[in-house]
């Protein structure tokens, strides 16, 4: 943050300050349906309707002062404008779709299972290969890092880390456009979009030095940590901030003690709300869960396996589940967009 955190010096063909016009300003702030609640919810994420425009397709479903969780089903690439989020880092998980993340610091090809981390202030466009795209996005007002316990004091990932530097894909194919004209950048600031027209192409960088750049990491490259008995959720941790953590549940061996019960035990997250986004496979602890579903279990009340899930897990050797988890240290508010796709009876699904 500021002059103490990661930074990058970028070298441009032109001054990146040449604003010709500021056009529209409009709000994209999440509209809150339930600010204070204690109900567990299931959201049917694939019920979010596809929309042509990338920004218009982004539907905020859960939010607090630290982060916003967004579902998006864009059908078209961002052709007519560039985008810059000055409020938050963006972690974009690609559930469906392939294409190219084009940024001022180079391009990244993406596919199913990729996390794309775009630091705040990076100007970018999304190019999709087809119209069939599904994204799970976390906007973070706090910087997103790899977990500190995976790194030594030099910043090198240690041998017990479930991924290594080689798994993190840096931008390639630096585009340098030495062009003068009118270039529309949609800038997000304090939950408003400002349409700003610049006199020079925003992708006019000829090179850069530093540590602040976008990168990609595939959930399929996360090496699971397993044990003879049930392991706690931190073994799945992939990213962290000082306000929430992000975990990856991937195919792995179940607990292999002779008397182990693979299903998790009932537990209360007293200090955090738990959000699970179900990507693929059969999630062992849940009944009636499909790809694209989101479960929200608020802090303060217990949750655990659905009836029958514990019994079904006995004797199983492995799981093929794939899911992304976000645990926030502040309570999450439920938005109006979330209520459109919510199962209002989910909290009763543990009744036997």
Identify the function of each model-found stretch.
Residues 1-352:
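Jelly-roll (double-stranded beta-helix
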């Amino acid at each position: 943050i500021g002059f103490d955190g990661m930074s990058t010096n970028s070298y441009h063909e032109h001054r990146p300050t040449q604003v010709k016009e500021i056009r529209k300003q409009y709000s994209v702030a999440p509209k809150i349906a339930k600010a204070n609640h204690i109900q567990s919810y299931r959201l049917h994420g694939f019920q979010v309707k596809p929309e042509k425009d990338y920004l218009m397709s982004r539907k905020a479903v859960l939010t607090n002062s630290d982060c916003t969780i967004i579902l998006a089903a864009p059908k078209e690439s961002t052709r007519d404008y560039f985008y810059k989020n000055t409020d938050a880092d963006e972690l974009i998980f690609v559930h469906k779709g392939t294409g190219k993340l084009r940024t001022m610091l180079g391009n990244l090809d993406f596919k199913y299972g990729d996390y794309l981390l775009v630091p705040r202030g990076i100007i970018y466009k999304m190019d999709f290969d087809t119209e069939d795209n599904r994204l799970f996005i976390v906007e973070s007002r706090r910087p997103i890092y790899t977990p500190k316990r995976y790194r030594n004091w030099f910043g090198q990932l240690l041998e017990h880390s479930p991924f290594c530097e080689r798994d993190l894909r840096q931008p390639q194919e630096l585009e340098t456009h030495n062009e003068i004209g009118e270039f529309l950048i949609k800038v997000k600031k304090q939950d408003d979009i400002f349409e700003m027209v610049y006199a020079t192409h925003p992708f006019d960088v000829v090179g850069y030095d530093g540590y602040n750049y976008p990168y990609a990491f595939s959930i399929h490259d996360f090496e699971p940590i397993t044990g003879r008995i049930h392991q706690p959720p931190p073994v799945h941790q992939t990213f962290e901030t000082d306000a929430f953590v992000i975990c990856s549940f991937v195919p792995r061996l179940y607990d292999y003690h002779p008397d182990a019960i693979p299903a998790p035990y009932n537990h209360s997250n007293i200090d955090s709300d738990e959000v699970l986004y179900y990507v693929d496979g059969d999630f062992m602890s849940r009944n009636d869960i499909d790809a694209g579903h989101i479960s929200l279990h608020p802090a303060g009340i217990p949750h655990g396996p659905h009836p029958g899930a514990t019994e079904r897990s006995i004797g199983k050797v492995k799981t093929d589940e794939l899911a992304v988890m976000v645990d926030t240290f502040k309570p999450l508010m439920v938005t109006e967009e979330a209520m459109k796709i919510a199962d209002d009876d989910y909290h009763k699904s543990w009744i036997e």
